[in-house]
Swiss-Prot record:
It comes from Caenorhabditis elegans. Residues 188-226 have a biased composition (Polar residues). Disulfide bonds: none annotated. Residues 227-244, 551-570 have a biased composition (Low complexity). This is Zinc finger protein somi-1. May interact with swsn-9; the interaction promotes hypodermal differentiation. One of its GO terms (molecular function) is zinc ion binding. It comes from the Eukaryota. Residues 179-251, 352-377, 513-582 are annotated as: Disordered.
Length: 582
């Protein structure tokens, strides 16, 4: 058994320990791990002129041991970091101040200031607890416990953490520049015509442009133009503002989004459907657009019809370059963007001799039918009540109080207490008549329609509806020579009863005959006679009834012939019994 060599000198021992530590440090660097610079040694320091294995094993055991005691001879003497090994230091990771219980050694001092950088590196976490010195009652003196070597980052991890921190700082600066940009300077932009112009993005320039557009676009000095350019709403009556626009730029479509402009109020909308709704609700925009179209026609310019391929290719509906929109210039009727409807409607209005101007009901004029009828009745009652009051006052009854209109509940409850009809009629107050306006108007319109019904010349078909007659002609009597709506209208107008000279009773007879022959009536279906048993039973019943009737007639004739017969007692024989029926 080998004994540890006797200690000869402390200087020689310290030199050998430093050499051994340098060897271990080099091995640790090669293996990718760092060794703690202030690990105490538990074994006794001794010198060996042969191998020095005792110092090596003792230092290794001290590093791996959890209960190594710091010797008193080492308490006042610490080795510098340059003597052990050089450790790269990262300034952002080490704070300027630290808490007293935290051991401020460079490999372990990763404080809360570096929490933003640690999670970004794999294997480098901030949840490793800092080193706190612990004391034990069993060992005398001060004791230190080294942290585990697995949590200590190596040089490559520290360099990677520094690179990630620098990249995150650059990204954060870029985000701050995006969120809080500097004021933009006027830049030159190239328009669609190839002319350079400078546009200012400042708020003052934007306000000035908005004020100029409001002053130039408005057709009159009236500020009630319900348009997005003058109000904060994107469409009339809606709460969505229009998109910001450049008034000089008419190229509003890009590859990503679709933007359309109303040429009347210069309001930009995100889609054609929203522009359609705006033009349909805003009457002034329709008038301005229709006026532009009529002015173009008067000047000899032939603008494309809305909805056609030429209009779509020229950008009439999309950008409004030529002032076109889905509004019919003949009848001022709003049309959808569907090109089939627009083409058919405009062709019909152009061919018609007198295009009808339809009265457009505004929002404040719209009323439900119930409210309209109730309002008319109230006005009629009030008018008659005022007339009766004026007549009663002119008749000399100045002191008679005004009587309120009667109610149905009052009549139902106190009908027995009222005066007689004669006395009631002689008084100044008279009951109000029941209104019959609706029935009279309805009957008058019905009679007018019946007097001018459509009568087919080829058959007995009669109808009061134009669509029914048109469908009847297309189905039963196709006429391919009629290709335009105008020819169809002329044909249908010629089939009216007034033009054919049929009216009065003759027209009523035709209508009644058509109703009787119509398939719409509830006629009973004819029974099918395919079943032979049912037909035979019906024939047998008919024969039996005929034979029974003949037998009864013969008996009646025989009884009448025996009327003078008597047996001396003036007693007539009883009639024969009736025949037995099967």
């Amino acid at each position: 058994m080998l004994k540890p060599p006797i200690i000869t000198s402390n200087d020689n021992n310290n030199t050998k320990v430093a050499e051994n530590l340098n060897d271990l440090n080099n091995k640790g660097k090669m293996s990718g791990q760092q060794i703690e610079s202030f690990s105490p040694w538990h074994a006794q320091t001794s010198s060996s002129a042969v191998t020095g294995t005792s110092e090596l094993f003792g230092s290794t055991y001290a590093m791996l041991s959890d209960h190594s005691v710091y010797p008193e001879q080492w308490s006042g003497k610490q080795l510098s970091q340059s003597v052990l090994f050089e450790q790269p230091q990262i300034q952002p990771l080490v704070g300027n101040s630290y808490d007293p219980p935290v051991r401020f050694d460079p490999p372990y001092a990763y404080r809360a200031t570096a929490t933003g950088y640690m999670p970004t590196v794999p294997g480098l976490s901030t949840n490793s607890s800092p080193y706190y010195p612990r004391t034990s009652g069993y060992a005398a003196g001060q004791q230190f416990y080294a942290p585990s070597l697995s949590g200590v980052p190596n040089t490559q991890q520290l360099i990677l953490a520094a690179q990630v921190a620098q990249a995150s700082n650059v990204q954060q600066q870029l985000q701050q520049q995006v969120l809080r940009p500097e004021p933009l300077r006027p830049a030159t932009q190239k328009s669609t015509n190839g002319v350079h112009r400078s546009t200012s993005n400042s708020s003052a320039e934007t306000l000035r442009n908005n004020s100029v557009s409001a002053a130039t676009v408005s057709p009159s000095d009236d500020n009630s133009l319900n348009s997005p350019a003058l109000t904060s709403s994107g469409s009339a009556g809606s709460g969505t503002p229009p998109l910001g626009i450049d008034l000089n730029n008419t190229d509003l479509e890009s590859g990503d989004e679709e933007r359309v402009m109303c040429m009347a109020c210069r309001g930009v909308y995100p889609s054609r459907r929203s522009l359609t709704g705006h033009i349909g609700r805003n009457e002034k925009c329709r008038e301005i657009i229709g006026r532009n179209y009529l002015d173009a026609l008067a000047q000899g310019v032939n603008p494309p019809i809305p909805g056609t391929d030429a209009a779509i290719k020229s950008g009439a509906i999309t950008t409004g370059a030529d002032g076109m929109s889905p509004v019919c210039p003949f009848c001022d009727r709003f049309i959808s963007h569907y090109k089939g409807n627009i083409r058919r409607h405009i062709n019909q209005c152009r061919k018609s001799a007198e295009p009808m101007k339809r009265h457009r009901v505004e929002a404040h004029e719209k009323q439900s039918p119930k409210k309209k009828v109730k309002k008319e009745q109230n006005e009629m009652y009030q008018h008659e009540y005022n007339d009766h009051d004026s007549s009663s006052m002119s008749g000399g009854m100045m002191n008679s109080p005004k009587i309120s209109p009667p109610s149905s509940s009052f009549y139902g409850a106190n009908s027995s207490d009222l005066c007689s009809p004669g006395e009631y009629s002689n008084s100044a107050y008279e009951p109000y008549p029941t209104p019959m306006l609706e029935n009279t108007e309805r009957t008058s319109t019905e009679t007018a329609v019946l007097q001018d019904a459509y009568i087919c010349e080829d058959c007995d078909f009669v109808t009061v509806y134009k669509g029914n007659m048109k469908r009847h002609l297309n189905t039963c009597h196709p006429q391919p020579e009629f290709k335009s709506l105008k020819e169809w209208d002329q044909k249908l107008e010629g089939m009216r009863a007034s033009n054919l000279g049929i009216s009065g009773d003759r027209l009523q007879e035709r209508l009644a005959a058509h109703k009787a022959n119509s398939s719409r009536g509830r006629k009973p279906r004819k029974k099918k006679e395919n079943n032979t048993e049912e037909s035979e039973s019906i024939d047998f019943k008919n024969i039996l009834n005929s034979e029974t009737g003949a037998l009864l007639e013969s008996l009646a004739s025989s009884s009448s012939s025996m009327g003078g017969y008597s047996n001396g007692n003036n007693f007539q024989p009883p009639p024969p019994p009736p025949p037995m029926l099967l």
